[in-house]
From Swiss-Prot:
GO terms for molecular function: nicotinate-nucleotide-dimethylbenzimidazole phosphoribosyltransferase activity. It comes from Roseiflexus sp. (strain RS-1). The active site is at E318 (proton acceptor). This is Nicotinate-nucleotide--dimethylbenzimidazole phosphoribosyltransferase. InterPro entries: Nict_dMeBzImd_PRibTrfase, Nict_dMeBzImd_PRibTrfase_bact, Nict_dMeBzImd_PRibTrfase_N, Nict_dMeBzImd_PRibTrfase_sf.
């Protein structure tokens, strides 16, 4: 049995008993029931994920996966492909937005080369899972083979397992790859059936002509390859990206280990759709951090029945929204664990008429 098949088989339902116990405790903490809104529901969800009625999340990490995209040669991005490798080095040197926000919330940044089109120098904080020097240009040929698609997902599973084995108890997903909003829009259109124009945005800032070109390229690719919306590996192979597959694997791996995974923006959303087509049972393990400016993100939420925690108008990627989301998860669990109950505090409860 493959690592992918083994992992999918291990994803079970949430622990209803732990979730019920968490809800019961929330209901007797020194506050009106429901007064903390989503934070209460979030703590109950995490209790169900972990099987611990008072979960403590003390070792967060964000896995940032980077890869290049052959389709970027079609002029679909505002930035050249060499920016991918340059930004990976920026991550490793601690100078990117994700590094700042991860430091702020106390999370480790794990950087993974899934297919950057450059020979990156060895670095103790860089994990080399390179599948190739970027994907093929999916406007004329499949982005990768089906074998590569499975290998990309399994690389993500392995990265999640390694992090969890090292003590990580909550994961966030992040991405870097020039051209990856094009691949993500193609994935989202393929799986949701939405018109390409409805799920395609400006990415890193293409102008009107660039946006029109981007839409046309995706429409051409979908017409050429006709990916099967019910087969995540087929969609990934035909119009996806190595980092998108890797992130899908991180989500599956985390779910199989009963570890909450906070998904970032549009690229992570596309990866979540891939993960969900492979294993629908992954859905309750996913925590959507934020609503991206990218217009296709809403289609992801609709298909996966997810509600993001916040909307700050972000569209950077890298896992920036996800690490902020992790801090909310930690806060929610601290509320559940550390607040006193009415009985413990000697506070009178609600008057029952």
């Amino acid at each position: 049995m493959s690592l992918l098949s083994e992992t999918i088989a291990r994803i079970g339902p949430l622990d209803d008993a732990a979730a019920a116990a968490a809800q019961a405790r929330q209901d007797v903490l020194t506050k009106p029931q429901g007064a903390l809104g989503r934070l209460e529901a979030l703590s109950v969800q995490i209790a169900g994920i972990t099987g611990n009625q008072r979960p403590r999340l003390t070792n967060p990490a964000v896995i940032v996966m980077a890869a290049d995209h052959g389709v970027a040669r079609r002029g679909v991005s505002a930035y050249p492909s060499e920016v991918t490798a340059q930004m990976v080095l920026n991550f490793l040197n601690g100078g990117a937005a994700i590094n700042v926000l991860a430091r702020h919330v106390g999370a480790r940044v794990i950087v993974v080369d899934m297919g950057v089109a450059a020979n990156l120098p060895s670095h103790p904080e860089l994990i080399n899972r390179k599948m190739g020097m970027g994907t093929a240009d999916f406007s004329v040929e499949p982005a990768m083979s089906r074998t590569q698609a499975q290998q990309a997902v399994e690389a993500g599973i392995a990265c999640a397992n390694d992090a969890i084995d090292a003590g990580v108890d909550i994961l966030a997903t992040g991405d870097m790859g020039i051209g990856n909003t094009t691949a993500s829009s193609a994935v989202v259109a393929a799986i949701t059936g939405r018109p390409v124009a409805d799920v395609t945005g400006r990415g890193a800032g293409v102008d009107d002509a660039g946006l029109a070109r981007k839409i046309a390229v995706i429409e051409q690719a979908l017409a050429l390859h006709r990916p099967d919306p019910n087969d995540g590996l087929d969609v990934l192979a035909k119009v996806g990206g190595f980092e998108i597959g890797g992130l899908a694997g991180v989500m599956l791996g985390a779910a199989a280990r009963r570890v909450p995974v906070v998904i970032d923006g549009f690229i992570s959303g596309a990866a979540a759709l891939i993960a969900w087509t492979l294993a629908p049972a992954v859905q309750p393990y996913l925590i959507a951090a934020h609503r991206s400016v990218e217009r296709g993100h809403e289609a992801v939420f609709t298909r996966l029945d997810l509600v993001p925690l916040f909307d700050l108008g972000m569209r950077l990627g890298e896992g920036t929204g996800a690490v902020l989301g992790m801090s909310l998860c930690q806060a929610a669990c601290k509320i559940l664990d550390e607040m006193a109950t009415f009985g413990e505090a000697g506070v009178s409860g609600k008057v029952e008429n």
